[in-house]
Amino acid sequence: MPNFAGTWKMKSSENFDELLKALGVNAMLRKLAVTAASKPHVEIQQNGEQFYIRTYTTIRTTEINFHIGEEFNEETVDGRKCKSLATWETENKMYCKQTLLSGNGPKTFWTRELRGDELILTFGADDVVCTRIYMRA
């Protein structure tokens, strides 16, 4: 079983602004979000297939607590409430499908994958994908 536990600092980010555009976030809020999320700090606790992930930015802290294969409540990148289900896509990669609880919007998901000493995080909204690469702190 892969060990995601630890503290992670972002090394690079691609397409975050494009992802926010695909989610319908206005230009002013996108600029604020891109600036605030430019240096996120992530802490992951793992006990087998149980995960607790806390992400800190300058404007907010998000927390999710989930077990692989069990639905849980969370929010999309733009703050809409959803039901999520994380499953193993490969031995080192989890895939999480998000289903909005109300309203319409693009199909969203996220993945987290361990590749060597890196944590690869992707967020998707329909066909737009944001990739963020983290290193252990």
From Swiss-Prot:
Keywords attached to this entry: Cytoplasm, Retinol-binding, Transport, Vitamin A
Domain of life where this protein originates: Eukaryota
MF terms in GO: retinal binding; retinol binding
PROSITE patterns reported in the protein's UniProt record: FABP (PS00214)
Motif (Nuclear localization signal): 21-31
Pfam families for this protein: Lipocalin
Subcellular location: Cytoplasm
Cited SUPFAM superfamilies: Lipocalins
Disulfide bonds: none
UniProt keyword Transport present: yes
InterPro entries: Calycin, Fatty_acid-bd, ILBP, Lipocln_cytosolic_FA-bd_dom
GO cellular component labels: cytoplasm
Family: Belongs to the calycin superfamily. Fatty-acid binding protein (FABP) family.
Function, in words: Cytosolic CRABPs may regulate the access of retinoic acid to the nuclear retinoic acid receptors.
Entry domain remark: Forms a beta-barrel structure that accommodates hydrophobic ligands in its interior.
Name the record gives this protein: Cellular retinoic acid-binding protein 1
Native source species: Hippocampus comes
